[in-house]
Amino acid sequence: MHRKILASLFAAAALGSCAHQPVVAANADMAWSLRPTAGETTLRFETPRGDAALLSLSCEPHSGDVDITLHAAPARMSLVALSSDGQRSRYIMEAGLGPADEPILSGVTKASDPVLQRFAETGDLMVFASGHGQMLPLAQEKAAKFMASCRR
């Protein structure tokens, strides 16, 4: 009996090790960075050197539109959800390649999106893709500045 249980546990562990890596996964050293320029403002959750990012939000100043880019492992599904303090929105994203030929999912939403409004108020943001979620550290001040630059 115990051998059957141990064999089952071993098989489950072996199968678990073959599971695909989550599409959404942050490195421990990642942090938010806000990059305002004359033509575009970008809020990125990235490594300190800026060489790898998980999520980028960008907009032309006062355009009312926000571009969402999820820097992720190649994904078969292009449905991404963002959640902030109880608000949740889903976005149909386009799979493609970024400037460094890295896989990305990209889409556009309005600066008036309820999730982005809550993100600006609370700094709380969680990203979901392909059944996996990643809570990002609070960034209220940077989120508020970013959203203020995007609103009409």
PLM region descriptions:
Residues 19-21:
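Bacterial signal peptide processing site
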Residues 76-89:
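Extended low-complexity, serine/threonine- and proline-enriched intrinsically disordered segments
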Residues 88-152:
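Internal interaction segment
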Residues 36-41, 74-78, 119-124:
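A short, compositionally biased
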Residues 47-76:
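Short, surface-exposed binding/anchoring microloops in extracellular/periplasmic proteins
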Residues 26-47:
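Post-signal peptide N-terminal segment of mature Sec-exported envelope proteins
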Residues 1-7:
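Bacterial N-terminal signal peptides that target proteins for export
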Residues 12-15:
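Bacterial Sec-type N-terminal signal peptides, specifically the leucine/valine-rich hydrophobic h-region
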